[in-house]
């Protein structure tokens, strides 16, 4: 029986195919996951491309950080593997490693309401920028320019994905009030 293809909302991006590897149909991906051991031990199916074609994950090898070599069921020669170049590689969100209490998936932040701890609404998360040190959310504010808020404990009091909101403590100078004159 063929694996049902998940919707775009049900998958997480783990990488992108950058090339074929070897002659036996393995693919090389640039990974954006640090959960390689979980991928190796617990994930049985990956999905490739916009159409999210299912492939059985047979083997995962990490020759260096950020690069994975995958063996996929049905991909047995270099020509077939080369045809997958450029495809996004996803897994079902339910197959991902469980998150710790203070962790989140980036896609979960989009569209959340950002509320000041005093109760006033600041705006809605439009974009997430990954800086390496910490994530930064771009908050779209009605009638004002967007603002950037770092996702750090000093600023974020509560992140409640289920309630659709992020409650923040505004540190002095964190938001530019556009210097609007009355």
Swiss-Prot record:
Single annotated GO MF: ribosome binding
Pfam families, per database record: PRC_RimM (PF24986), RimM (PF01782)
Domain of life from the UniProt record: Bacteria
Keyword rRNA processing: yes
Keyword annotations: Chaperone, Cytoplasm, Ribosome biogenesis, rRNA processing
Limits of the PRC barrel domain: 101-174
Gene3D superfamilies to which the protein is assigned, alphabetical: PRC-barrel domain (2.30.30.240), RimM (2.40.30.60)
GO BP terms in the entry: ribosomal small subunit biogenesis; rRNA processing
Chaperone keyword on record: yes
Main localization category: cytoplasm
Entry's Gene Ontology cellular component terms: cytoplasm; ribosome
Compartment annotation: Cytoplasm
Domain comment as written in the entry: The PRC barrel domain binds ribosomal protein uS19.
Similarity annotation: Belongs to the RimM family.
PANTHER family with a match to the protein in the record: RIBOSOME MATURATION FACTOR RIMM
Functional summary from the UniProt entry: An accessory protein needed during the final step in the assembly of 30S ribosomal subunit, possibly for assembly of the head region. Essential for efficient processing of 16S rRNA. May be needed both before and after RbfA during the maturation of 16S rRNA. It has affinity for free ribosomal 30S subunits but not for 70S ribosomes.
Assembly mode: Binds ribosomal protein uS19.
Listed HAMAP family: Ribosome_mat_RimM
Name of the protein in question: Ribosome maturation factor RimM
Gene: rimM
């Amino acid at each position: 029986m063929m694996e049902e293809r998940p919707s775009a909302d049900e998958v997480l991006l783990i990488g992108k195919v950058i090339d074929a590897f070897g002659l036996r149909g393995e693919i090389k991906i640039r990974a954006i996951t640090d959960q390689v051991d979980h991928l190796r031990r617990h994930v049985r199916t990956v999905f490739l491309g916009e159409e999210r074609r299912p492939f059985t994950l047979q083997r995962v090898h990490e020759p260096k950080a950020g690069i994975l070599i995958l063996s996929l069921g049905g991909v047995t020669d270099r020509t077939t593997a080369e045809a997958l170049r450029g495809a996004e590689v996803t897994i079902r969100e339910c197959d991902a490693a469980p998150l710790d209490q203070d962790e989140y998936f980036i896609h979960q932040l989009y569209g959340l309401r950002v509320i000041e701890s005093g109760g006033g609404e600041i705006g809605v998360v439009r974009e997430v920028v990954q800086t390496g040190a910490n994530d930064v959310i771009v908050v779209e504010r009605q009638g004002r320019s967007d603002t950037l808020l770092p996702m750090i404990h000093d600023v974020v009091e509560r992140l409640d994905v289920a309630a659709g909101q992020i409650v923040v403590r505004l540190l002095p100078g964190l938001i530019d009030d556009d210097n609007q004159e009355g």
